[in-house]
């Protein structure tokens, strides 16, 4: 049986990232010119590597624009999954991050169970949603190579799922996830001498940006 492989990539640089704006459905206006360039470099690298069996993207514009560029190079369709979206920020969507944090009155990373604005989703609620959909997608693709184009939070959520991390970890540690970076996980045997013993997820690469040349 072939191992299941998961390739996670973050979208290219977006206007909301540059402006420091909360980039939900209202705040996200897509990729910058540089972000489009990053997405093209990402697409060229993915095309040169092992074939991808299935590909998914989050619905936010910056991720979909990245996915469109990648799909053109891979000559394949990419499925948009609503529940892969980043945390819902409610009334904070489209507002400057500095203003949102000031109104919240606390450092968000220290309060993973509290939403930063009315109608928003807490970090712990987001993790519950995203890890469930990641598990669902992977259960449909045993032995396949799966690509997911998402956000920094998507990459972090996968680590929480595979490593059994808790939401409170956000207070003491974080994962660097750069624009258009690649993170790879693969299911490998618990014991190479006894493959029937089961599988576990192994991190092969994290935040790989070797394809970004400028």
Set out the residue ranges of the language-model regions.
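Active-site-proximal alpha-helix that buttresses catalytic centers in soluble enzyme cores
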Residues: 2-4, 9-76
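Generic beta-sheet signal
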Residues: 6, 144-152
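Short active-site segment of divalent metal-dependent hydrolases/proteases
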Residues: 14, 154-155
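Short beta-strand scaffold positions
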Residues: 57-58, 128, 149-150
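Acidic, low-complexity terminal tails and accessory targeting/binding regions
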Residues: 1-4, 87-98, 144, 160-214
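Conserved histidine-centered catalytic loops in small-molecule metabolism enzymes
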Residues: 2, 51-83, 105, 186-214
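Phosphate-handling substructures
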Residues: 16, 72-132
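Glycine-rich phosphate-binding loop signature in dinucleotide/nucleotide-binding domains
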Residues: 48-51, 137-144
